[in-house]
Amino acid sequence: GIISTAQIGFKEKDFYVNTLAANLRAIEKELKKARKIAPKGILGFNIMTALTNYKEQVLAAVKAGADIIISGAGLPVDLPAFVQGYKTKIAPIVSGKKSAQVILKYWDTRYKKTADLVVIEGPKAGGHLGFKKDELEKYGFGACKKDYSEEVLEIKKVVQEYENKYSKKIPIVLAGGITT
């Protein structure tokens, strides 16, 4: 299961006076709770790059033993550096071919690393996806579903380049906003 870190510490007593500390404590607590429920499950966090304390939250999740970090709401350019030396897998959230190309090339060039998983969120998912107005009009609610399906295939081609380069399978997860 995947746990969001957005204000994860809201139940902590000191949340309103020491929000960062409360959130960091809660990351470890929530992962421990999840491990009790699913001891053999794959457990991780969805951490938005737009968060003020993104790095601190990633490090807390990694040190707590997260199996995977999924990051979007911007490009997680430094995510490989934050998990270096740990077994935690990394997965960017992309919305189009361009964002997939940019993040995978950046990680390859800067860190000699690629994604362990790629998450695709379509234009109908809402949130922090980085679509331009013309793309929203092209792929949005009134648009033909076929158009974005073609974009998904283009993302898949980009991912395949890095599968070949790193001789590893990189699963693609369609997270939402593709057809609904």
Regions found by a protein language model. Name each.
Residues 1-166:
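Active-site entrance/lid segments in N-terminal catalytic domains of soluble metabolic enzymes
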Residues 171-179:
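Glycine-rich beta-strand-to-loop/alpha-helix junction loops that act as flexible
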